Amino acid sequence: GYLSLPADTPEVAAAKVAHFAAYNAAAARSAGVVAVAPSYGYAAYGPANIVIGADGVPLDTPEVAARKAADAVAHARAAAGLPAVGPVPAAVVPAVVGSVPADTPEVAAAKVAHAAAHVEANVRNAAEAVGIHGLYGVVPSVYSYGVVPGAYSVHYDGTLLTPDGVPLDTPAVAAGKVANAVAHIKAKSGLIV
């Protein structure tokens, strides 16, 4: 059945209907009068029974899958009646995986070069940011009556932050990331045919 649940046999379905009918009849006989204020709820409570695939895309219900199959059959039958056309010159499209064409060797090489340029720019920006930060001289402190050397002297552990609050890498971490990225790029460039 749907969602990999076994479907009820006709006997089980009839027994469920009889059980719920008897249950509701007994509940109606024993129910007293309760004054309840009217409440206006939502049209639906909770999510619909949507099954999500491994790639994060909702899977088709059996009805939708059947409709798609019927539609594909109708298109195939309609196309079968069309006259045959000779070969049309077109660009060669590489193998398709997951409905996305595979990169040509030129595109793959360009992507590797582009990624390397991004890594170099990030390292350069991180090095410049580390170079401009540090102690700003002597500033008044709100925690004492004197002056304290440095703007970050009070409760400052030396962590440098970007304008959006993300900690910057230390020079050692930045160098390690560059070495790692270069190793990956070299490994990927060896895969290009």
UniProtKB/Swiss-Prot annotation:
One of its GO terms (molecular function) is structural constituent of cuticle. Keywords: Cuticle. Component of the cuticle of migratory locust which contains more than 100 different structural proteins. This is Cuticle protein 18.7. It comes from Locusta migratoria (Migratory locust).
